[in-house]
Swiss-Prot record:
ATP binds at G110, A111, H112, G113, K114, T115, S116. This is UDP-N-acetylmuramate--L-alanine ligase. The gene is murC. Pfam families: Mur_ligase, Mur_ligase_C, Mur_ligase_M. Pathway: Cell wall biogenesis; peptidoglycan biosynthesis. It comes from Streptococcus suis (strain 05ZYH33). SUPFAM superfamilies: MurCD N-terminal domain (SSF51984), MurD-like peptide ligases, catalytic domain (SSF53623), MurD-like peptide ligases, peptide-binding domain (SSF53244). One of its GO terms (molecular function) is UDP-N-acetylmuramate-L-alanine ligase activity. PANTHER family: UDP-N-ACETYLMURAMATE--L-ALANINE LIGASE, UDP-N-ACETYLMURAMATE--L-ALANINE LIGASE-RELATED. The keyword Metal-binding does not apply. One of its GO terms (biological process) is cell wall organization.
Length: 443
């Protein structure tokens, strides 16, 4: 039976993906959000999904309401109206917990790498069998006939609490979201609770000391580079076109695999996918075939060339992610100067990880910083400024603004890596316009 769904905050990455998936399954879908452009809305518009401004007139008794987690009666007219009228609504994660019960579900959790790993798992599975999926880059695909459902499992505010998947990968555990989690132990406890809800098998990165502490009711399989793991990636051959490696499970050689992505972290993500699909009974020859054709996910090492200048856009907003992105860029462009342009995301994270951010960014050849992007969940109380981070960085560079990205032109034979979870893309677009104008003036 088809339903009509109204999404309150439809441009959110998870919300837009869910909207697309339900639309493709034959349901009527609409949603509301702020007017500001967000990268997820292109897919919604291409699908013909209506995006409305927030208005209580959108809330009627005949629609099923799905509300973004950031919206409350005190900051959203639609939530306030729904509460006043006695209309019920489900939060994104509550809806998802119910929805996945109709499938064999495969989750991907972890502090870092979950979007890329979810995208890789979904890509391989959809090319082998009918699969619905939700990826944290705003991509979703729904099929009424799908037996399998692949989804990204988010730890923030323990949103993964309603999820009970058949299988799950956990890529790592790290201290992040200091506006919610109080300590690394608090983060661990959240993941450990989630792990206990996995039904058939759990796949965790064995070189993460926190993940070695995980307990679960289902069997736990460790993957990694070291021999004490259940699934071991070895004979790694990185190149400027990707990575080649072999995997063994105990004494069994599972084969040689290739991925068109860069950095050791992506080899680990692929090993997790191989381990999960091997235990789930998939043909590894087919898995190997489709690993080769993975095109990546949005805002994860997304490359473009503007007038012979290489520009990379990445969502990295935690020190661990910055290190991985710089590592990947070095693998693909070993002879180029690596210029990092970073926008810190949230004041709480910047304060909590100031030294770690500096250490990570010092891995680049030059570092430019944008002003801190504050979250809607917090206020700037003046405790930290981007200049505090700049003072800890020992590479050439400085501060840039959207209006003036010309300092970035001081580099020859460079690859430019724009990183952040805020509006860092506006800085990237400004630099691209600058490059285009320079070329036009020369001609």
């Amino acid at each position: 039976m088809t339903k009509t769904y109204h999404f309150i905050g439809i441009k959110g990455s998870g919300m837009s993906a869910l909207a697309l998936m339900l639309h493709q399954m034959g349901h009527k879908v609409q949603g509301s959000d702020v007017e500001k452009y967000y990268f997820t809305q292109r897919g919604l518009e291409q699908a013909g999904i209506q995006i409305l401004p927030f208005d209580e007139k959108n809330i009627t008794a005949d629609v099923e309401l799905i509300a973004g987690n950031a919206f409350r009666p005190d900051n959203n007219v639609e939530i306030a109206y729904a509460d006043a009228q006695g209309y019920t609504y489900k939060r994104y994660h509550e809806f998802l917990g119910e929805f996945m019960k109709g499938f064999t579900s495969l989750g991907v959790a972890g502090a870092h790498g979950k979007t890329s790993t979810t995208g890789l798992l979904a890509h391989v599975m959809r090319n082998i069998t009918d699969t619905s999926f939700l990826i944290g880059d705003g991509t979703g695909r729904g099929s009424a006939n799908a037996q399998y459902f692949v989804f990204e499992s988010d730890e923030y505010e323990r949103h993964f609490a309603p999820y009970h998947p058949e299988y799950s990968i956990i890529t790592n555990i790290d201290f992040d979201h200091p506006d919610y989690f109080t300590s690394l132990e608090d983060v661990f406890n959240a993941f450990n609770d989630y792990a206990k809800q996995v039904k058939n098998a759990l796949f965790v990165f064995g070189e993460d000391e926190q993940l070695r502490r995980i307990t679960a009711n289902a069997p736990i399989y460790y993957y990694g580079l070291e021999d004490n793991n259940d699934f071991v990636a070895y004979d790694l051959k990185p190149s400027t076109s990707g990575s080649q490696f072999k995997v063994r499970h105990g004494e069994e050689e599972l084969g040689e695999f290739q991925i068109p992505t860069f950095g050791k972290h992506n080899v680990m993500n692929a090993t997790a996918v191989i381990a999960n699909l091997y235990i789930a009974g998939f043909d590894l020859q087919l898995v190997a075939e489709h690993l080769k054709t993975f095109g990546g996910v949005k805002r994860r090492f997304t490359e473009k060339i503007v007038n012979d200048t290489v520009i990379i856009d990445d969502f990295a907003h935690h020190p661990t992610e910055i290190i991985a992105t710089i590592d990947a860029a070095r693998q693909k462009y070993p002879s180029k100067e690596l210029v990092a342009i970073f926008q810190p995301h949230t004041f709480t994270r910047t304060i909590a990880l100031l030294d770690e951010f500096a250490d990570a960014l010092n891995g680049a050849d030059a570092v430019y910083l944008a002003q801190i992007y504050g979250s809607a969940r917090e206020t700037d109380n003046g405790q930290v400024k981007v200049e505090d981070l700049a003072a800890k960085i020992n590479k050439k560079g400085g501060l840039v603004t959207v209006e003036n990205t010309s300092p970035l032109l001081d580099h020859d034979n460079a690859v430019y890596v724009f990183m952040g979870a805020g509006d860092i893309q506006s800085y990237e677009y400004s630099f691209e316009r600058l490059l285009s104008n320079l070329t036009n003036n020369v001609q």
